[in-house]
Amino acid sequence: MSISNMTSTVWPDLQVPAVEYNHLPILTVALLTVIASAVYINVSSAQDPYKVSSIPTVKRPRVLDAYRSGVWWRIFVPRLVPYIEEGYHKYNKNDQPFRIWLGGFQTYAYVLPERYLEKIKNMPESEASFAAMANKYFHTGLPTGEVNNLVLQVASKLVNGNLATIKTLMQGEVQKALAREIGSPRQWTKINAWQVARKTTEAPGLRVVFGEELANDKTFVTGVSEFVSNITVYAFTLRYINLGPLRDFILYLVHWRHRRSLPAVLTPLNNVITERKKVRSNRHISDDEESFDCIQWALDQPVSDDCKTAEAIARRLVVISLGTIDTVAGVLVKQLTHLASHPECHEAIRAEIRECLAEDDKGWTLKSSARMKKLESFIQESLRMSSGAISLSGMRIVTGPGFRLDDNTILPRDSFIAIPTRNILYDPEVFPEPEKFDPFRFYKIKEDEKNAGPLSNRRDIRASWLAFGYGRQACPGRFYAINAMKAILGEILLKYDIRLAEKQAPSIDIDLDPMLAPARSTDLEFRVRA
């Protein structure tokens, strides 16, 4: 029985109209659905016009990392090094980039294969910038002021250009610092490695940056030491928590207490800068009267007037002091630990130092230091094993329209790019037996290359020694840092015997994403040589 007949039987007076099927509404809904889907797909694809989503992601599971490492707090700060290693072998070794989340910077880093080193080597800041990366992710503007051309000019051109004279000053300051911190103990005496590294880098760093007057002002020295020591601590406070759009505001509040300690540094520094400006405006200053320090070099720079106010210069010099003191100390403490762990190389390095100093009756000069190839090899090997202060190098922010990869994928503006330094330095195809500390590895490689002649097809190892970055935007203070390390390690070897305080080799660094922070609890033992 049809529905119409059933209805008329139950309700005889009800008239049921004949049903005519109209397919137009159904077709309209279907068409609108297709259009909406097309629009959605188009919008979705428009959000990735550069094909960035095609780059694989290496994940860092927090709970699993805490379990693997056996450290509970890794739930909040998972390690970075093991996962970069995973991406390096899975993707970079197959000539592919990958991306990985940097908790300390709250952004993805696009980690590029080694062959991109040549592409970024000579890139100008208008295309990819290290300074922009430092200002954005280290928030240098919060405690002091952003890295600008004045900082780069003073650090790269003037400090490096005056290294011959700086070297003499540096050696004298190091000798005085060692006399204060270690003295002349006849018996083995235990001293904290970080304390030795900090004080021996602080002495020459203060003298070169702030001049003799302020370097001998105990109140000023204490203020600078405390402020610089806290820069890294405050820099990573709350950085591992996703604060969303409130991030910059909250970090500004976090740095408030840190900024309160800045006047203790800026006030006396401002006074010195103002006085020098006043003297120069009243009379001609001869070359012999010119002060030899970064204050003077900053005053002499051809930069705009707003960058040369006493306040502006003072703030930028504090940024430079971070590099000459705290950063160098963080690397040096690892080298002291390596030195104490490998007594078998001490006599060979000592003999070379004595020989080089004897050839130059002027003592520790830039020329004599440059001939200390075994000491330099030790420093390079220590940097290779510890990767310096960070596990990535070549860090830049893309400042141009985009960074084109070979497969036509383009990393858009503001992308964070980097090279996997630590993994390249631990690659057995680059350095055989990478887990072994060989203090004369680089010395032997250079001797082999020298004997092979200019037609050798050997791999350029300089492209694999990346602790100071690479190319035109590498660390501007690297030459100062290397000479400071030579001065300190050389003086220690000549004057002291050194060994580990504990029989078991201590840890060298701590993986704190993206930093490789030095272990500050390591104790060493020193004894003056007969």
Curated annotation (Swiss-Prot):
Its cofactor is heme. Heme binds at C475. One of its GO terms (molecular function) is monooxygenase activity. Pfam families: p450. It is found in: Membrane. SUPFAM superfamilies: Cytochrome P450 (SSF48264). Glycans are attached at N5, N230. It is an enzyme of class 1 (oxidoreductase). Its EC number is 1.-.-.-. It is a single-pass membrane protein. It catalyses: preaspterpenacid acid I + reduced [NADPH--hemoprotein reductase] + O2 = preaspterpenacid acid II + oxidized [NADPH--hemoprotein reductase] + H2O + H(+). Pathway: Secondary metabolite biosynthesis; terpenoid biosynthesis. Keywords: Glycoprotein, Heme, Iron, Membrane, Metal-binding, Monooxygenase, Oxidoreductase, Transmembrane, Transmembrane helix. The chain crosses the membrane at residues 24-44. It comes from the Eukaryota. GO terms for cellular component: membrane. Cytochrome P450 monooxygenase; part of the gene cluster that mediates the biosynthesis of aspterpenacids. Performs the C22-oxidative modification of the terpene synthase sttA product preaspterpenacid I to produce preaspterpenacid II. It has still to be determined how preaspterpenacid II is further modified to produce aspterpenacids. Belongs to the cytochrome P450 family. This is Cytochrome P450 monooxygenase sttB. It comes from Aspergillus terreus. The lineage of its organism: Eukaryota, Fungi, Dikarya, Ascomycota, Pezizomycotina.
